[in-house]
Amino acid sequence: MATLLQIGSGVIYSNALRKTLRRPQSSTCIIVTETTPCNKSPTVQRRSANYQPSRWDHHHLLSVENKFAKDKRVRERDLLKEKVRKMLNDEQKTYLDQLEFIDDLQKLGVSYHFEAEIDNILTSSYKKDRTNIQESDLHATALEFRLFRQHGFNVSEDVFDVFMENCGKFDRDDIYGLISLYEASYLSTKLDKNLQIFIRPFATQQLRDFVDTHSNEDFGSCDMVEIVVQALDMPYYWQMRRLSTRWYIDVYGKRQNYKNLVVVEFAKIDFNIVQAIHQEELKNVSSWWMETGLGKQLYFARDRIVENYFWTIGQIQEPQYGYVRQTMTKINALLTTIDDIYDIYGTLEELQLFTVAFENWDINRLDELPEYMRLCFLVIYNEVNSIACEILRTKNINVIPFLKKSWTDVSKAYLVEAKWYKSGHKPNLEEYMQNARISISSPTIFVHFYCVFSDQLSIQVLETLSQHQQNVVRCSSSVFRLANDLVTSPDELARGDVCKSIQCYMSETGASEDKARSHVRQMINDLWDEMNYEKMAHSSSILHHDFMETVINLARMSQCMYQYGDGHGSPEKAKIVDRVMSLLFNPIPLD
């Protein structure tokens, strides 16, 4: 393996870099003049997405410093952590107080410090008789239901039957109960009927009515309207965890009657400390990206190293996983680059050569590629082999066959879409989704993620991931694709691209665009039900529950990135720049 790594360095790398296309004066051109090994004609017409350059300056990134995360703050955080631990284990707390405390710790982003304690509390509670709480309090019942299901416990939706019997007599002023009921409904599985058909629509309508009634009122010191609007905008269970934490810290700090000053101070300091760690990681991957030369040389591709790092925070935010985040940022950036080669720039003949290169995985055949592809393939080759070398060294498993196959699979899926576009083929929705689950790139991401994240690698797991046999991966990939399609398909069709899920459904059924979009949104709901089912059945799965959670987190992250537009292609228009600033560059002020 060392030989493979050595081959992809030195002279070959330098020659590839020098031969790669130079940046033209404008990145919005449609006609590019060049001569390549596969095309002797001096003029090749190519598409352009007109992507804007990165708005993040590398040298500015290197200068970022978090003054709130000094050693003094780390010591202060650790002292507060022990105080919070004592509060969590306080036997004088009522059961509801304990559930609410756990919920606050999770929403404030500090529950990772107390995973063992929280798991013990919930496991013990799950085994006890809980009929008293079920009969008396909607908020308590719904909160318990959500926390149990979030942690993979199999709780029946029947706990809500006692409330449904008097559905018309619900206390509409019980806003806490309604919010808890609404949030609990998003933990439904494909086996549940009442949660989706009755409970969620009812709770949603009550919350909308509450907003309409109180939007111009001062509803107490803690702005309940803001909390309800946030929930309606995106249910907590679907939200990117780190972003939700940043919002909740501010909301929690507004409380007057029931906020815990120790907890909120602990959460603020911890947020800033973790942010400082993330900043250092971002500096490292930004430097790597500059060294590859890809952002400069492949002018037509999205230069999005900061956004690619942002994706990894959504998948796994805890400070101890810095190597995982940095490695996966590199994979994300390389996938973004080849996606744009297939979608925008390459001719069909060139793309076929590129796909063969991934199949062969042979650096000695580099010169068979068009000049602009050589550097890209070489960087991918080097990075993947480097990852495999580290895994062989630390975990004693050769993962090159699995990593290589994941790149071959995604390149073949990209090529299928290029052929569809070239031929004018319009797939039906099922045909489209079978390919799109792979072309969205998440199966490739998950194979690499599993290799660098898991302490103990299983060949059986690698084989099922490589063969696309894990249903939770299929569901997460589908949510990723559909969330992307809902906001990017108009721009992609305008520049010339294959039909997306919305257009496939319209063509297949004759539905209007509005109905097609509604159908896609329902597909996302159904996919979440399937993922929730897989999570509750994790005890019979060969996937470790921690890895399964990162798979689900990618679905959350995709809905964050595409909530208001194409957050990866046009981050400023989609509010992603503001979100990146809040998580990576703006520390929380401390009193």
Swiss-Prot record:
Gene3D superfamilies: Farnesyl Diphosphate Synthase, Terpene synthase, N-terminal domain. It is an enzyme of class 4 (lyase). GO terms for cellular component: chloroplast stroma. It comes from the Eukaryota. Its EC number is 4.2.3.105, 4.2.3.106, 4.2.3.15. Mg(2+) 1 binds at residues 339, 343. Keywords: Chloroplast, Lyase, Magnesium, Manganese, Metal-binding, Plastid, Transit peptide. One of its GO terms (biological process) is response to herbivore. Pathway: Secondary metabolite biosynthesis; terpenoid biosynthesis. Involved in monoterpene (C10) biosynthesis. The major product is beta-myrcene (56%) followed by (E)-beta-ocimene (20%) and minor amounts (less than 5%) of the cyclic monoterpene (-)-limonene, (+)-limonene, 2-carene and tricyclene. This is Tricyclene synthase, chloroplastic. It comes from Arabidopsis thaliana. The lineage of its organism: Eukaryota, Viridiplantae, Streptophyta, Embryophyta, Tracheophyta.
